[in-house]
Amino acid sequence: MKQRTLSIIKPDALKKKVVGKIIDRFESNGLEVVAMKRLHLSVKDAENFYAIHRERPFFKDLIEFMVSGPVVVMVLEGEDAVAKNRDLMGATDPKLAQKGTIRADFAESIDANAVHGSDSLENAHNEIAFFFATRDL
């Protein structure tokens, strides 16, 4: 089934200048970039986007990291886009990520792990709406 999902290329990947390589992974695996923008998240936006993690011990570090530099936010579209994106990203901890996944190849740590991807179709809809107006899609 054709789906849309949200992907964020995080500050660590932008600092390493691997944005193009990451986008190529998506495109060469059947995911089309249908919307994209580069921005610098405010603390408030980062806190709102990651509100589900507010009570978790890593929340403060996550927010500090996500506002430490610019990010690239994209809507990816393709067959089973949510699952395909998650497979391409690899495990949250790059040390556990399968060889050839984005996190295994470009991430440094569980915190600086290069990319974010929606974990369900419902969350994909909500996350896309957080960053993109319907007219932009």
Curated annotation (Swiss-Prot):
Keyword flag Kinase: yes
Pfam family, one: NDK
Top-level EC class: transferase
MF term (GO), any: nucleoside diphosphate kinase activity
Keyword terms of this UniProt record: ATP-binding, Cytoplasm, Kinase, Magnesium, Metal-binding, Nucleotide metabolism, Nucleotide-binding, Phosphoprotein, Transferase
PANTHER family to which the protein is assigned, alphabetical: NUCLEOSIDE DIPHOSPHATE KINASE, NUCLEOSIDE DIPHOSPHATE KINASE DDB_G0292928-RELATED
Protein's UniProt name: Nucleoside diphosphate kinase
